[in-house]
């Protein structure tokens, strides 16, 4: 997986979801 450069440790949500990223292991990754 490619890291989207966004953390989701505090909230289990990625603002980068709009470009196809999702939260995995407290980091946002591109699927």
Curated annotation (Swiss-Prot):
Entry superkingdom: Eukaryota
GO BP, one annotated term: defense response to virus
Family recorded in the similarity comment: Belongs to the cyclotide family. Bracelet subfamily.
Pfam families per record: Cyclotide
PTM info: This is a cyclic peptide.
Protein name: Leaf cyclotide 1
Cysteine pairings via disulfide bonds: 4-21, 8-23, 14-28
Tissue: Expressed in leaves.
């Amino acid at each position: 997986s490619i890291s989207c450069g966004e953390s989701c440790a505090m909230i289990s949500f990625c603002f980068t979801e709009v470009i196809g990223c999702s939260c995995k292991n407290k980091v946002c990754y591109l699927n």
